[in-house]
Amino acid sequence: QVGASLYDGLSPTATGASDMKFVPRFVAAEREHDAGATDSFEVRLDRRMRREAVEWATRHPAQAAYLALVKMGRMWNIWPNEPSFSTWPVRLVVAGTYVPVMILALVGAWRTFHLGLPYMLCWLPAVYFTLLHAVFVSSIRYREPPLLALIVLAVAAVSGPISGTPSRREGP
């Protein structure tokens, strides 16, 4: 069931952040149509929210695309989006730990690109989670899983020479 989450990310009131204040309105509307229904209430509620989210995005493609960009920005922002976490000390700690990893991940990607698929796959979680949260709501906390794979590339940036073949140690 993704209806509520989808509507949270694609609706006239969507901002990219989560705000589930719309749920009681949907619950009340679905309860009005409850008589004689064969499916469970939760299934019908999910379908209603999903349908309205898809219809809104279909009718407003430019707004949906803009909202996707906003959500991507929220996910990869260098500091917290939440105002209560936007004091300068918190911003500096978050940016001070995140920005170096990202810079090193980019350098590592450049250094390992010629090594093929295994290193390219380190970007796959970042692409997947970014696209997923471009549809649903987004926050910097959703970048944590892909950061683990990006750290592998960051290590490649600070490690020794990288070649296409394993290094061989010479005997004594």
Task: Identify the residue ranges that each predicted region occupies.
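Central hydrophobic cores of alpha-helical transmembrane segments
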Residues: 1, 121-128
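Membrane-proximal stem/loop segments at transmembrane-domain junctions that anchor or position
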Residues: 1-70
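Membrane-interface anchor segments at the N-terminal boundary of transmembrane helices
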Residues: 55-122
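Alpha-helical transmembrane segments of multipass membrane proteins
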Residues: 106-109, 130-134
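Membrane-interface junctions at the ends of membrane-embedded or membrane-associated helices
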Residues: 110-118, 151-172
